[in-house]
Amino acid sequence: MTKDVVIEHGESSKAPLVPAPVAAGVGRAVSIADVFLRFLSIVATIASAISMGTTNETLPFFTQFIQFEAKYSDLPSFTFFVAANAVVCTYLVLSIPLSIVHIIRPRARYSRLILVFFDAVMLALLTAGASAAAAIVYLAHKGNVRANWFAICQQFDSFCERISGSLIGSFAAMVLLIVLIFLSAFALARRH
């Protein structure tokens, strides 16, 4: 079964038609993958936010009365990291129903366009939060001799392990959001 298709500048070619059930099946598969990746992103962002938000460590200094404490809320970059992950996680939870609509109606175009836009905004927010936290984590591990900032990870090893681990979940969520944007763009491109 073939049909004349206009390619460019009035040229025509014989191209096979893709049966409608196959096209709908591919769209439905993309939508199912979209929902699955959103759930994975929710897990990654909430794990990162909880891991960073519950991080603190106290070390005694000479006596029990004098102690040094390291907690995430002492550093604005870590607070921003927790807030960014929480906002992205909330967005992902709220976007699940719209993604489920795409399973039922794979041809829904405008709602997919809305998801692409907000996915890109959330990717930017998550990247900003993770980048800000990564800079501080690097300073915690390596320090900066020129600025007289010493590495604290030799003393606060549990604190540093937790903040480093929370970055892994956030960067994984960034990769998943990039894949989500590409999937949505693929689904939109197939309709034209």
From Swiss-Prot:
Membrane topology note: Multi-pass membrane protein
Main location: membrane
Extracellular side stretches: 51-79, 134-166
Disulfide bonds, paired cysteine numbers: none
Cytoplasmic side: 1-29, 101-112, 188-192
Keyword field: Cell membrane, Cell wall biogenesis/degradation, Glycoprotein, Membrane, Transmembrane, Transmembrane helix
Subcellular location per the Swiss-Prot or TrEMBL entry: Cell membrane
Family matches, as Pfam families: CASP_dom (PF04535)
Domain of life from the UniProt record: Eukaryota
UniProt KW Cytoplasm keyword: no
Residues with glycosylation annotation: 56
Classification via InterPro entries: CASP/CASPL (IPR006459), CASP_dom (IPR006702), CASPL (IPR044173)
General function of this protein: Regulates membrane-cell wall junctions and localized cell wall deposition. Required for establishment of the Casparian strip membrane domain (CSD) and the subsequent formation of Casparian strips, a cell wall modification of the root endodermis that determines an apoplastic barrier between the intraorganismal apoplasm and the extraorganismal apoplasm and prevents lateral diffusion.
Subunit record text: Homodimer and heterodimers.
PANTHER family documented for this protein: CASP-LIKE PROTEIN (PTHR36488:SF12), CASP-LIKE PROTEIN 1U1 (PTHR36488)
NCBIfam families: A_tha_TIGR01569 (TIGR01569)
Family affiliation: Belongs to the Casparian strip membrane proteins (CASP) family.
Protein name: Casparian strip membrane protein 4
Organism: Sorghum bicolor
